[in-house]
Curated annotation (Swiss-Prot):
Organism: Arabidopsis thaliana
Record-stated family: Belongs to the DEFL family.
Keyword Iron: no
UniProt main location, coarse: secreted
Subcellular location field: Secreted
Gene Ontology CC annotation, any one: extracellular region
Name under which the protein is recorded: Putative defensin-like protein 203
């Protein structure tokens, strides 16, 4: 009976640790820089922005964002 309680407690601890760590790993992204100018104003600019950032580093992604009334391609990746 004691062995069953220990095994059950160990299983619960593993589930707790795994479920607690996953959202943090996915949510942590940091600004890595800007891609080529004028990318976001073109047709399918957001796709091109994403491709340019991924070409720099495969773990990065790109997003077109407005900054100082201009649209820029910003690259983000893991911190």
């Amino acid at each position: 009976m004691a062995k069953l309680i220990v095994n059950f407690s160990a299983l619960l601890m593993i589930i707790l640790l795994v479920s607690n760590g996953l959202p943090k790993a996915v949510a942590q992204t940091c600004f890595k820089g800007e891609a080529q100018e004028g990318v976001c104003v073109k047709v399918d600019g957001s796709k091109l922005c994403d491709l340019l950032c991924r070409a720099t580093n495969t773990t990065w992604f790109g997003a077109c964002e407005v900054e100082d009334n201009e649209t820029h391609c910003h690259c983000y990746g893991p911190c």
